[in-house]
Amino acid sequence: QGKPSFCTKPITCKDEIAPPQLELDIREKLTVRVGEAFSLTGRYSGKPKPKITWYKDDITVKEDKRTMIQTTPATICLGVLKSVREDSGKYSVVVENSSGSRKGFCQVTVVDRPTPPVGPVIFDEVHKDHFVISWKPPLDDGGSPVTNYIIEKKDAHRDLWMPVTSASVKTTCKVPKLLEGRDYVVRI
């Protein structure tokens, strides 16, 4: 048996270090309807184990009855149930450890039907066989631009609504095919 050998320098034991990595399974923009659920998911890694923080519009997201955060050793998920318009915003996730940080984001838009146009309807021109109306757009477009207005008319003494147009993008419309002396009701 020989004599033991000694190291020439002291050795320091330390954990393996790897900067965080982040791969999101989402696009940069996500549109959902009011009442629908949505989730933002991805995978991450790093040593030491990274800290995960979710944000909405730069404010830390907290779990509640509709918002859930799940983190496993390799995956992340932020889920929102029964979305409301106020859930719209820029969501981001930060994965960080002592070696650095990574950030991913997604712009979420929660859309709904627009509110009705602002009244009253203005009768710009009135003729014996037609009139021209105008109105103001809705105060709330539902989260996306109004693509068309549906205008209908009816004789004031009947229950049957007749379409005037369903393709108007303007806030003005000519209502044709009227009978002189009759009263009409219009809805937009």
Stretches found by the model and what they are:
Residues 41, 77-81, 136, 172-177:
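Exposed aromatic-hydrophobic patches
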Residues 1, 174-188:
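Beta-strand-rich modules
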Residues 37, 47-49, 86-90, 101, ...:
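Extracellular Ig-like/FN3 beta-sandwich strand-entry sites
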Residues 34, 46, 72, 85, ...:
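Surface-exposed loops/turns
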Residues 36-44, 120, 131-136:
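A short beta-strand segment in extracellular, disulfide-stabilized domains
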Residues 2-27, 56-63, 70-75, 96-99, ...:
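Flexible inter-domain hinge/linker segments at boundaries of tandem extracellular adhesion modules
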